[in-house]
Amino acid sequence: MGRAFEYRRAAKEKRWDKMSKVFPKLAKAITLAAKEGGSEPDTNAKLRTAILNAKAQNMPKDNIDAAIKRASSKEGNLSEITYEGKANFGVLIIMECMTDNPTRTIANLKSYFNKTQGASIVPNGSLEFMFNRKSVFECLKSEVENLKLSLEDLEFALIDYGLEELEEVGDKIIIRGDYNSFKLLNEGFESLRLPIIKAGLQRIATTPIELNDEQMELTEKLLDRIEDDDDVVALYTNIE
């Protein structure tokens, strides 16, 4: 993966450490989940997951409660929209947004692409086939060990809930499954009483590409602008 990958990862982690930017995105996910499925986490799996992800980023309880309450107000009039774009060097970009003003959102995104030579927004659906949608869960290896489970035991226990792949990364375990298995996998973790530290739906490129340091640095300028937009809650590329 090389230095370009390390640069990309370090830069992304640095950006997401800015809580002032993270919290609005997390709050929107909570508000939308509460709007769609009700304000009770016990009966709304999507809301439970949104709250779990917020807590993992140390979002205060007052902020979480306020985001849930917004679901029943005019501020809760959010919609989910996905936009797609291309950049230089064969880079493909998918942007998942939550917004109360789609006109503002697309205008902002177009301005970011227009400021980058060779980059452009493309019609929705143009890049969809270049990415696989996956359910992705993270848990701590120590929590698995506390349940007296080996990784093989965990894999066997979650296969019936839609597990496709299990990966050990440092002190964490990454579980991946089909996009449509998100709810089922969540139930699998609950049945095991295994705490989840992060969960979500991700898009994984079918044919990743590698960029050299110079290409990565140029591309990063566009990705920075996109990720700094409060309406953008998730950004996916085909960069390795």
Curated annotation (Swiss-Prot):
GO cellular component: cytosol
Listed GO biological process terms: regulation of DNA-templated transcription
Pfam family, one: Transcrip_reg
Top-level taxon of origin: Bacteria
Gene3D superfamilies: 1.10.10.200, 3.30.70.980
Subcellular location: Cytoplasm
A GO molecular function held by the record: DNA binding
InterPro entries: Integrase-like_N, TACO1_YebC-like_2nd/3rd_dom, TACO1_YebC_N, Transcrip_reg_TACO1-like, Transcrip_reg_TACO1-like_dom3, YebC-like
Major subcellular site: cytoplasm
Alphabetical keyword list: Cytoplasm, DNA-binding, Transcription, Transcription regulation
Similarity comment: family membership: Belongs to the TACO1 family.
Protein name per Swiss-Prot or TrEMBL: Probable transcriptional regulatory protein jhp_0149
Organism: Helicobacter pylori (strain J99 / ATCC 700824) (Campylobacter pylori J99)
